[in-house]
Amino acid sequence: MAPGRNIQGTFKDLLILNQGTFGNASGQFNYPIPHSNYLSYIQLYIENTNGATSNTGHTIESDISQMRLVIDGDTVWSGEPRMLRKMMHYDIGKYPDANETQVGGAVQWCAVKIPFGQNDFDRDFLLPAHKFKDIQLQIDYAWTDNATTGFASSSSNAKITITAKMLEPTSAPVPTYFLARKQTQNTTFASTLNGTQQDINLPVGAGNGLVRRFMAHVYEAAKQDGVAITNYEVVLNDSVYLVKSTWRASQTEDQNRYNASVLKAVTVVKADGETYASRVGRLLAPISVPSVGDRSLGATVAGDTLTFAYAVANTGVADATADPQYLFLESTGVPYSTMIDFGTENIGNSINVTAPTVTSFKFRPTIGTITSSAEFDLVVEQVMLL
């Protein structure tokens, strides 16, 4: 199925909100999105200021639990910023823009994109904003203020800028297909599940359109990527196997298709013996931390977690001073995630989960080795027509 609308008109960049404050330490941020013409995407820039000494415990991604785009009461986009940014990572092939610094008083920020088309200038897939009475952006947040491990004065320092790319048509508006992304799973796998196969239900039935692709994510700190889930299947109606693969083979396919890789820059404030969970899987090389002044510095790696080792030069005596260290972390693929793709190259290959013959659609992972518990998330991308 292809929409074939090819809407004619002019694309324009729209500033919806500039440096709006969240206003509270926690709650739900609501903001109306213009409901006229067509929208190609909405772009969010969110920032907050670190505590006076440092911020070793919180990031923009960690303190926002959910983002939603609600259209006339229906949620068409939803997810944690970490997961929505992982989808961005696949689309652009690199770690999305962010400043994840732990330095005291510094500004952390990250970008989250909500695209409705296959690219920024897609004239076939657009959100027909003109069709709706109300479009609301909702963000659930709980900023943690702390002088050493959190943010500072978040009620005034936490800010958001909202922009969009809009198509102003030169002909009468018509309904169009658009892409929607929904986080359908946000749970944990316990170690008691090791060696078992789990059934994760994907959406089926009226209102769910076509499933173009979905992304699965599983993470446990200090574990290498591809350990918590070893292999998986995608099954239609409990009998038709659409995909059978291993986690690592699937990630290799992702690299070939999306050219996805990681080069993550981060400034951490750590002392001798302290750790940092980088959330970057299968690091390409050991971390090398340069010497500073009269100190020799280094770090060892276990899975995604770095343990820092500082010593006074020529003495071997541990140096407990916590200084900022600027790190480049590199790996292939999108960390701890894989994309199961049906319709990126041809929308017609997407799975029509509204068909009366479709009664179940499942992601079936085999759990490998989990030490304690691993977070598991799943985001589904659908082709919609409201």
Label the model's feature ranges.
Residues 1-386:
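Beta-strand-centric surfaces of beta-sandwich/beta-rich domains
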